[in-house]
Structure formats: C-alpha cells, structure tokens
Amino acid sequence: MFWKFDLNTTSHVDKLLDKEHVTLQELMDEDDILQECKAQNQKLLDFLCRQQCMEELVSLITQDPPLDMEEKVRFKYPNTACELLTCDVPQISDRLGGDESLLSLLYDFLDHEPPLNPLLASFFSKTIGNLIARKTEQVITFLKKKDKFISLVLKHIGTSALMDLLLRLVSCVEPAGLRQDVLHWLNEEKVIQRLVELIHPSQDEDRQSNASQTLCDIVRLGRDQGSQLQEALEPDPLLTALESQDCVEQLLKNMFDGDRTESCLVSGTQVLLTLLETRRVGTEGLVDSFSQGLERSYAVSSSVLHGIEPRLKDFHQLLLNPPKKKAILTTIGVLEEPLGNARLHGARLMAALLHTNTPSINQELCRLNTMDLLLDLFFKYTWNNFLHFQVELCIAAILSHAAREERTEASGSESRVEPPHENGNRSLETPQPAASLPDNTMVTHLFQKCCLVQRILEAWEANDHTQAAGGMRRGNMGHLTRIANAVVQNLERGPVQTHISEVIRGLPADCRGRWESFVEETLTETNRRNTVDLVSTHHLHSSSEDEDIEGAFPNELSLQQAFSDYQIQQMTANFVDQFGFNDEEFADQDDNINAPFDRIAEINFNIDADEDSPSAALFEACCSDRIQPFDDDEDEDIWEDSDTRCAARVMARPRFGAPHASESCSKNGPERGGQDGKASLEAHRDAPGAGAPPAPGKKEAPPVEGDSEGAMWTAVFDEPANSTPTAPGVVRDVGSSVWAAGTSAPEEKGWAKFTDFQPFCCSESGPRCSSPVDTECSHAEGSRSQGPEKASQASYFAVSPASPCAWNVCVTRKAPLLASDSSSSGGSHSEDGDQKAASAMDAVSRGPGREAPPLPTVARTEEAVGRVGCADSRLLSPACPAPKEVTAAPAVAVPPEATVAITTALSKAGPAIPTPAVSSALAVAVPLGPIMAVTAAPAMVATLGTVTKDGKTDAPPEGAALNGPV
C-alpha cells in the first residue's frame, strides 16, 4: 500500500551532492544516508572517500564530542560516522584499511588515559574489528608495528569494548595460517601472563573481571577451534600457556598470597573452573554425538591438576573463613553471615575436582575433611539452592566414580583421568590403578567420617518436627531427597553396592533401623508424591483412529497428520451433504460388483400396440433363445481385442409369401467377451442340428448356472405360453445352430428395402448416445465392409448379455435402411428390391431408477434378436407358432449405429394375430399393417401413447398411425 499510493519520498542526498560546497554534516543530517551508502550510490561514495571526509569520520568516532551539545544529539554524528565506516562497502573499507594515516588517526584513540568513553570505545572496537575481518593483512601488519598496542589494550581492559577487540584478534583472523601467526605474536607479547597478572587484589574489579573473562574465552575458543579443524595443526600457543602449571600456580598465588578479596578469588576461580571443564561421560560409558577431537579438546590437563593440588588447603580455608561480608536482608529475614560468592565458587571448584576423580586430590580432600565442611554448609544455609546443587554434584561424583573404579578393577585395566589430548604436548594425569586404591577412599569417607546417612535422617526428622509445629518446610529438602535417592540406588544395584551395604551394616542398630524405615516408608511416599504429574497426561479422545502417539507432546509431524485428518473429516461431511445423493434414491444396496452401474439412471417405458399384430410370433421365434450370462471372472480380459465368428439370423417374409430363415456368413469382428465367449463358440460349433430353429413347444437344453454375481446382468426372454418358464438368472443353452456356418443351397432371397419409408420422428442430428455399447458396436458396423461378401451392407442388431439398456441417454434416431438387390444377394433375386418390410425396434428397460452400465463385449449371435447381412437363407418352419407374449429381461443392448432391431416382412394380406400382452419389463408388438417402427429415447418413443422416463405420455409424431404406414 505504501508504494501503491506513491508515498515514498525521494532522497535528497543526490540534490545535496549537486551543491558545490556541501558538508559532511549536512549529508549526515539526512536520514537515508546509510541506505544510499549501502546501495553504493557512487556519487555519495566518491564524496565520503575523500581524504578530508575520511579524516572527519575517524575523528568523530575517536574524539569526545563537545560537552556543551545537547545530550540526545551529542553522539548522533559519531554513531552515524561509525555506521558509515562499517557498512561493509568495499570502497570505504579499502580506503580506510589501505591508508596508514587514517589507521594512525584511529589508533590514537588508545593513547587516551583510562577510563575511556564506553560509547566511543565501542565505535573504535567495531571499526577496528571490521577492518580485521575485511582487511586482515594490512591491519595486522599495521598493529604489529605498534609496540605499545598490546600494552594499551591491556591498559584499557577495564572497558569491555577493548576486551572484545582482543578476542577479535584471537578468533576472527582468517585464514588459519594467518591466525596462527597472530596467536604466536600475542603469545610472544605475553598476553596470557599479563592477563593473569591483572587478576590481583591490587587491580580494579572491572579489570580483574574482564581479564578473567578474557582468559575464559581464550580457553573455550582455543578448544573449540582446535576441535573443529580437520587437519592436525600445531596446538594453540595461548591455550598451552594458560594450561601450564606455572601459569596456574601464578594465578593461585595472586589469589591467596596477598589480601584475599572476593573479586580476586571469584575471578581466579572462574579461570580454574574453565580449565577443569571436561566432556561428561554418559551413565553407560557412552559419549554424546560429538567428534572425537571435540572430546579430546575438553580433557583436563594434568598440569592444571598439579597446580591446584597444593592449594587445596587454601580453598578449604576459604570455605571456613571467607572474606567478610555485611549482613544482607533476604525474603526470609536478615542473613547475618551470608555464604558469599567466594565460598560458592569454592564449592563449585570442589565439585569439578571430584568429577576428575584424581586419586591424589581425593586423598587430599579426605585429609582436609572438605566434604564434611560442605555438608555443614549444606545444612546451615538451607535456603541457598546454588550451594545445595554443588553439594549434590559432589556426592553424585563420589558415588559414580567409585562405581567406575569398581568396574575398572574388575576388568583389570587401569583407570585414567582423561583421554589423551590431541595436542600431544600436554601430559595427562595417570592415576593409580583402582586395585591399589584403598577401598574406595571417598565413599568410605563420605559414609563414615561425614556420616551422610545420619545427617540425612536427622535433617528429615528436624524438618518433620518443624512442619508439625506449623513451621515452613526447609528449602534444602528437595536436594536432600535426591541425595537420599542416589544413595539408595547405589545401595540396591551397581558395583558399589557391596561397599555401601557394608557401610550401612556397620551403622549402629538404631540408626540402621531408622534408615530402613526411612527408605521403605518415608522416601517411597515422598517419591510417589514427587512423581505425580502436575498436568494430566491422559490423552483426550481423538477422532483419528491413530492411537500410536504415546508422548504427551507429539512431534510436529503427528500434529500435522492429526490436523489433516480433521480437515478430511470435515470436508467429507460437507461434500456428502452438498454434493451427494439422497439415500431414498438408492435404497437398494447391491453387493454385486456391478451394482454401482445400476445407480446412474434408467429409462422406463411401455409400448402399447394392437394385440392382433403377427410380429409377436416372429419376435418370439428370434428371442426365444436364452442369452449367455456375463462372466464377471474375466473382467481383466474385457478390454482385449479378439476375433470371433458371429452369425445373425433374420426372419423375413419374402415376396412370394414363404417365410425364409437366413443365416449370416462367418465374419471376423471384435469380441470383448474373453475366454468364456470362445468356449461358448466352440461348444456351439460342435452341437448337432446347427442352423435349425427351435421346435415349437420343445423344451430347451438344461440351464447352465452362472456366477451369482454374473447372473445379475443376464437377459432372460420368457418362453411361449406352452413352454416351461425358467428361473431368472439361469441361462439355458440354445444349441449351436446359430453359430454353425450354414451350407444350404443358394436360394432366391428377398431383402427388405426401406428407401420409401418415412424417417422416425427424430433426426440423427440429435445427441450421440453415450452408452459404451455405442462404442463397442461401432466395430460391428465397420465390419460390414471387411468380409468376403462385399454386398453385405445391412446394419447389425446386437444384444449384449450384460447390458440393461443401451439407449439410456440417446434420443430417437432414424431407422437405418436395409437395401438389397440381385448383386448383393448373390443372385437370389433380380428386381425384387421394392418389397417393403416391417421393422420393430427392440427397446429394453432395466427398471425404475436404473441406467445401463458400460458393456464390455459385443453381443454374440445367440443373444441377437435379428441381424441382417448374410447371403444364405433357409425356409422358416411354418409350424413354428406365434408367441403370445414376449418378456425382455433387462440385458438387451441396441447399438445406435445399427438401430434396426428386428426386420419383419409381412404380407399385406397376412392374417391378423392377437396382440401379445404388455410385460412389465418390455412388450413389443407390431400391429396389422405394413410396418411400425419402435424406438426408445430418454423422453420420447415413436409409438402412440408411449410412456417416457419422466412418467408422461407423449403424443405420437405427426403422420404416425396405429394401424397404418408411417
């Protein structure tokens, strides 16, 4: 929005630079001068890099501003000058670092007498530090030429900014070779020894504190950088000097030989604690996932331990007689004799020394009875948790290292204080073998001389009495509980168990009984209370079924998964509510695999026709054969193309009045029926009586039971009234007559010619059928021009055994015309193509609310009601009676490309036959007359009084009559 409304202000720096006599102060008054400088405005950089401007910038950060200036703007220009000099612009850095006159002007800041202005000192340190990082060689060369540089820095070490500058020289010099040269230069200047000298009671507290902090940082930086280097370089000379025994002894001498001040004792002890920092070993003797070099770099040098050991008595005296402190007011009252920072650091040093597990130091501490003194302080200063923690660490170190000694003794190996250091120049402390140690000296001392068990019991009982009297619970009870638990754990298990058990058994009887009662009752109850979770860990019920998350705080991936599950659940619910179907529309739930196809849509219609139509007999004669069920077991092969030999039979009435039965010649066409269709083909070829129509009243072959699921898609045509009905879902074999290639003598054939017929009510320009049967049967129509008989141009009518309705969404189409002459009929007729035929369209419905599924196969001949296009024909047996009723099961599919379902040639003088009754599923009847075309559409059929899917009755198309030509 800021840029949208063009609120950005234009910089005035360029305008000022266009002036002839612009000053640096005028430019620094602009707020965007830093942005322009970092953007490397060349005109501005050229102005700033002038000698006069550079000198003015350096003077601003090294000279105190006038005192008469207002305080809030007094250091404005020095701050801006420092930012300009350290903005990491190469042009400015090169100009400042490459000019010794500017460096000398900058260096003169150190010649001021202490104390330095802290703010100006920070500007100076930042500028020099930036030059050390950017122009290392030039700056280091310049500083080496200054003999008093280290002395001046140490002179102003009380200013923290100068301490930072010294650390930059130690850590920020690159590459490693140049850094090593700088370290050697600093070591030659005796930086470590001079810093140690600053830790003296005669020095200011700030100088002592900063000198101590500098030494601690040098130790840590030296160890860290030494461990991070892959190649084995020479050791850090500064770290080696600081870890030397002479340096440690000098430090301790400065601490204790003069007037003992708390600041000196604390500062010196901090350096010793840093030198004693070690890599802690895990409870199972495993180190954490750091490199081996890092472990070695944190090892304690034996020279440090040798330097500290003679001064243990001084630290013991420090714990007894610390520097005097005044009484202080605390939240629990006035503390007359505070513990003091010096004694606290002394306790920290004892814990660090015990952690090294040096036998000589352990023996000296036992001789001095230092642990007993620490326990006295523990129970005296009940509210000093810093002290309580250090005493707990001391006891834990004694017990854990005693166990380590036992493990070493059992393995017969020698226990070392530390692994070898990577430097190789510092020898490591090699303690005596654990086997030669006198019976775990520190453990025995802790339980016998220090009376740890008795002190725990006495303090616990005293606290119970205090609380019973209405007093406060003591502040050290938490640490006392942890100490007691450590004793019990080492008593119950571990290598030190035997030794502690002997010590406990050596206690007086009353004390031993109190301890056992304390462990079994009091301590157990306390631990039970302490282990109660402050926050309930009971997991709330989640809508997700994933119950594998056991942590109270699941990780990020688990949270994301739970949120995703929640979103999916909400989205699914909304989707079903908004875009789903109503349950009442699909009340029947089929277990069949094809059930989803039943729920799409359906077309239900009935056709009323004249009961005297003779077409019912011919329709029944063609449809009486049972249809092969769809085999669901071969779903994986339904899309594979294969060849099959199909035959179609059409019943027509030629011009001379004798009915003929014609069989189609074998043709190659696509079949998608799979293995089952091939087997059926072979069976029909081998069956006797091929090509013979079924005798009237004759019972068909025994039914073949199909798969229960496959039977759901079978098409059943009921037998005539005199035949035995068959249960739905059972398919009967109709013989192989329809599959056998007929070889009858050529006869004269008469073909129906529809050129004079009127088209159906709907044109072919309507929407194309979306049924899969349309696609499947397109191959059948294409095969008309591929056979050996070029004249077979008739449209096919196919009935699929698994199709409930092929015209579920298509509109009424024109009936394709069937034309034949002497050339196409093989010489059967010469000029008899004007014979008109009656065509009945088979339209099948699946029932209310259903739509035909996609058909995977091209219908076989036994499922076909009629198919035209064969050269051979035979006389139809006149004894075949006309059926009274035709019932079509919902499995007949009619390809839109071959819309002619049944072509029946009727004689104009033919007798009237009663019209068959209309079945609930389908009733197709052709009235008396030359022709009546029946077709199906989603909402219209070409018959009088047709019932559409919408449940409405549409009027017949114009020109249509019940008993007359269309």
Curated annotation (Swiss-Prot):
Residues 408-436, 657-707, 819-856 are annotated as: Disordered. It comes from the Eukaryota. GO terms for molecular function: protein phosphatase binding; protein phosphatase regulator activity. GO terms for biological process: regulation of signal transduction. Residues 408-424, 669-687 have a biased composition (Basic and acidic residues). It is found in: Cytoplasm. Ubiquitously expressed with strongest expression in the testis followed by liver, heart, kidney, brain and placenta. SUPFAM superfamilies: ARM repeat (SSF48371). InterPro entries: ARM-like, ARM-type_fold, SAPS. The modification Phosphoserine is found at S289, S771, S828. GO terms for cellular component: cytoplasmic ribonucleoprotein granule; cytosol; nucleus. The keyword Transmembrane helix does not apply. Protein phosphatase 6 (PP6) holoenzyme is proposed to be a heterotrimeric complex formed by the catalytic subunit, a SAPS domain-containing subunit (PP6R) and an ankyrin repeat-domain containing regulatory subunit (ARS). Interacts with PPP6C and NFKBIE. Interacts with ANKRD28. Belongs to the SAPS family. This is Serine/threonine-protein phosphatase 6 regulatory subunit 2. The gene is PPP6R2.
